[in-house]
Swiss-Prot record:
It comes from Saccharolobus solfataricus (strain ATCC 35092 / DSM 1617 / JCM 11322 / P2). It comes from the Archaea. NCBIfam families: PRK01242.1. This is Large ribosomal subunit protein eL39. Keywords: Ribonucleoprotein, Ribosomal protein.
């Protein structure tokens, strides 16, 4: 990908980067195990971003 990106695309990539993290353990404890994993998790090789 080019170094010079449109700002809107850069913001979308940054949002996807932040969303690609596991949920904190305290959320699992707070929800008593109802929320166990992040469904938005993706691997950079396997899944494609529609940005």
């Amino acid at each position: 990908m080019s170094r010079n990106k449109p700002v809107a695309k850069k913001f979308r990539l940054a949002k996807a980067l932040k969303a690609n993290s596991p949920i904190p353990i305290w959320i699992v404890l707070k929800t008593r195990g109802r929320v166990r994993y992040n469904p938005l998790r993706r691997n950079w090789r396997r899944n494609d971003l529609k940005v």
